[in-house]
């Protein structure tokens, strides 16, 4: 959790007090809210170098993790039912993985070293033909450990079969 950027907070305050309409509504406030969302998507898409249609706004991190993990798992289950994460993930990820386990997916929880970092050798050993997704947080929210995300990405990219990578 980080402090909100001051300009972003000012913009959100204005949106919540002035442009508070339902963006799906046809009245003035709704149209203004929809325009604000389109403007935000355009700015974010440009910054992230993605298409606007690739961006989804959710209510927060837990909903985003659920959408990504559960959605990707079910959408790709024909390719495999094995998922990999770490033992120190955010509770939202761990709960999503628990749910997926109850739905018949096989979950591997990677251990971390004394600094809270995943060992690439452990990840490589855990990968199997049935693996469809790896989820590793970039910076741990409790201890601040940084995971080797670039190295994990390269490892997964070099696999014969594509594996989704959730960070």
Feature-to-residue mapping (PLM):
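Pyridoxal 5′-phosphate
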Residues: 1-167
